[in-house]
Amino acid sequence: MKPRKVMIIGAGNVGSAAAHAFVNQKFVEELILVDLNKERVEGNRKDLADAAAFMSGKMDISVREASDCADVDIAVITVTAGPLKEGQTRLDELRSTSRIVASIVPEMMKGGFKGIFLIATNPCDIITYQVWKLSGLPREQVLGTGVWLDTTRLRRLLAEKLDIAAQSIDAFILGEHGDSQFPVWSHSSIYGKPVNEYSMEKLGESLDLKLIGETARDTGFEIYHQKGCTEYGIAGTIVEICRHIFSGSQRALTVSCVLDGEYGQTGLAIGVPAVLSQNGVKEIISLKLNEQEQQAFDHSAAVIKENIKSI
């Protein structure tokens, strides 16, 4: 069997946490690290090699340039322009990050990259769309982590309230990985029952779904303000998406996909349910949204498109 190879571009907090998660879960044979800080990335390589030595089997961990990528199956982009400096805005951050991405992706394509791009860099949806445009790859081969972490948080919050396993919950968040995301309660269920019908049966009361949705949205910001970054949750997100791609699980995850008419939208990438296969996005699932949800989706799409204009 052909060795499965993942390249992580950006060995900061997120990239390093993702690399460690790959080592622990051991379903790829080769892990490749890329970073401008050569001393740091070499230190990471050695540290990860030590961690891998405790695991069964063999994993090759190496350092390369991003352009040395012709044999890579999945390239995970976690690069960032760094924290905002005094006087900078989020738009400044977007433009700086966009410039970094614009310097990397064309070099990778010249290097013969034919695999799948997975974007975790924020703002995820905007950078995902930029990578797709720069790469010239089919849209199926470019996706972002999108709102899968937010969706997983939503399920965790519901599970904690109801004292059940999160895996028993079918609930989704759609839209931007940011302020305009929203839960799709019309398509959410627990053991086949609407969320609050199940809650009434088990707890004798309805849950505050609005508050739960807001908490799922805001948790990432809270973590950032409390510890200065988010890393473990998004690392788990990256690894899970890659696992489903490699296994060809054909499971639907809410990831950032380039739309071509789905949900009435084009010209952007946004978080929607998508079936994953070994070629990337096999199918985008078009849910029939109610009027309020469609309005929320259109608003979220408008927010993303406005930011795309700035790059």
From Swiss-Prot:
One CC-aspect GO term: cytoplasm
Protein EC: 1.1.1.27
Cellular location(s): Cytoplasm
PROSITE patterns: L_LDH (PS00064)
Keyword NAD: yes
GO BP: any one term: glycolytic process
Catalytic activity line of the entry: (S)-lactate + NAD(+) = pyruvate + NADH + H(+)
Pathway the protein contributes to: Fermentation; pyruvate fermentation to lactate; (S)-lactate from pyruvate: step 1/1
Catalytic residue list: H177
Function: Catalyzes the conversion of lactate to pyruvate.
Complexes and interactors: Homotetramer.
Protein family per UniProt: Belongs to the LDH/MDH superfamily. LDH family.
Protein name, per record: L-lactate dehydrogenase 2
Originating organism: Listeria innocua serovar 6a (strain ATCC BAA-680 / CLIP 11262)
Gene this protein is translated from: ldh2
